[in-house]
Amino acid sequence: MKSGISGFMQKQLSTIIFLGFFLFYLPTIVHAQAPKVTGHDIRFKVKGYKDSTAIIAHYYGDNQYIPKDTAKFDGKGNLQFKGKKELPEGVYLLVLPKNRYVEFLVGEQVQTLEFDTSDAIATMKVSVGQENQIFYSYQKTMSDKAKQAAPIKAKLGKTKNADSTATLKKELEAIDKEVKAFREKLFTDNPKTLAVKLFKAAQEPEVPEAPILSNGRKDSTFQFRYYKSHFLDNIDLGDDRMVRTPIFHGKVEQYLTKLTLQIPDSINKEADYVLKKASKSKEVFKYLVWWITNNYEKSQIMGMDAVFVHMAKNYYLNGKAFWVDSAVVNKIRDRAKILDPILIGKKAPNMFLTDSAGKLFTLDGFKAKSTILYFCDPNCGHCQKETPKLYEFYEKNKKRGIDVYAVCIDRKPDDWKKFIREKKLNWTNVWDSYTATDFKNNYDIYSTPVIYLLDANKKILAKRIGVEQLEDFYDNYFKDKIGGATRE
């Protein structure tokens, strides 16, 4: 038994709204007056339970289960959750034994709900609590009308008679018209309720036909652009309650990760747009700043550290992240300070290193169409395996203008020289003989090996790329950027 917006509503409501085949009717609701209390007092009568324990929990972002209170049945199916503190408003779950649950809304702090576990939606009775009266009446009616419309749809799928088809379509069109009218009335009459905001948030944009361009063809990108530009129209990101719903996180995540091109500039622009919409809600804003920063900091997609730096500069380091203490801000500042100079597209910091004979080789002075900047440690087991693979690639591709600037980060020259001899590394091998280079802070080297790819002007093209990825990268790079340099 699972009921509520994440169960019935997300699976059924979206289908109903998309097809527009189902009529709902919201009966006139008589609102019982809840007594004024301090804190919360939420009561359930559940048929089928006597001596068990139940929990109420709420959604938060992408986490379904944040426990808030526990109670025991009284032997007659009655539960009471009562406390001196008010519960934060949002979508809650009454979690029953055997992982069964029912969803309900906390809008009012005093509520009384009664249902049978065999079908919570059909049997739900709400005697106190406007939010849940709307929430369950809407779902029940939608469910009933879906069943009512199903035979019409089935007939339409089977009939081959043109007149019958036209008649059935008219019936569905009439239902669709009534659906829209009643839905509009519900939204108009109860605009500030969480229930209505949930129903609206579940709606998808209705995309019109693409316009015809001057060349006589349809605008092939119009529908996607329209869908994206209106995707967040119906979700109120300025309402604190939305952060405790099952719709909120998925909606924003889809917008930022599926509808937005996954390159830093695009993500940063859209993140700012979303956060501007959330600026009136401290809770939504707080969650989204945290989630966007955390999501892209952990991303395995190359270059997404630019999103972290953007979030750090524009939200954490300027005081907008009001919930973060100074210790956390300092850590974020330190991390952003390291990453900012070595983002893809920026010029790599110069280095002044020497070879085994003491000859100086600066990175800026290293001439190549593309430089493989390779950080390694002769005592690193992974370097022992990867270096021969890289050298093999280098031998095959050096005539394309690719050269290697191999940096030993270890301070023991004897181990390094032995490593060069044993691996027969006939490329530019350098180390910090002056012990003046901070590899960790200059290039974010906390483990080895690490590869950076640079263009002829030492602009960073890629970083932390595997040897096995070099072939494809350079095939595309030389084709697109240099004009098809070939292997010889």
Language model segments and positions:
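Bacterial Sec-dependent N-terminal signal peptides
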Residues: M1-F44, E488
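A non-transmembrane, solvent-exposed segment enriched in polar/low-complexity residues
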Residues: A32-P191, A201-A202, E206-G238
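Non-catalytic, surface beta->alpha helical segment in thiol-disulfide oxidoreductase systems
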Residues: L93, S447-V450, A456-R487
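Structured, charged N-terminal subsegments at the starts of enzyme catalytic cores
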Residues: S220-E283, V289
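N-proximal helix/coil linker or "cap" segments that precede and/or mark the start of modular domains
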Residues: K298-T354, K359, D364-F366, E395, ...
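Short, internal strand/loop/helix patches
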Residues: P349, I420-N457
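Short active-site neighborhood of thiol/selenol oxidoreductases, capturing the structured segment around
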Residues: F361-L390, D403-Y405
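Structural microenvironment flanking redox-active thiols in thiol-disulfide oxidoreductases
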Residues: Q384-R421, T435-N441
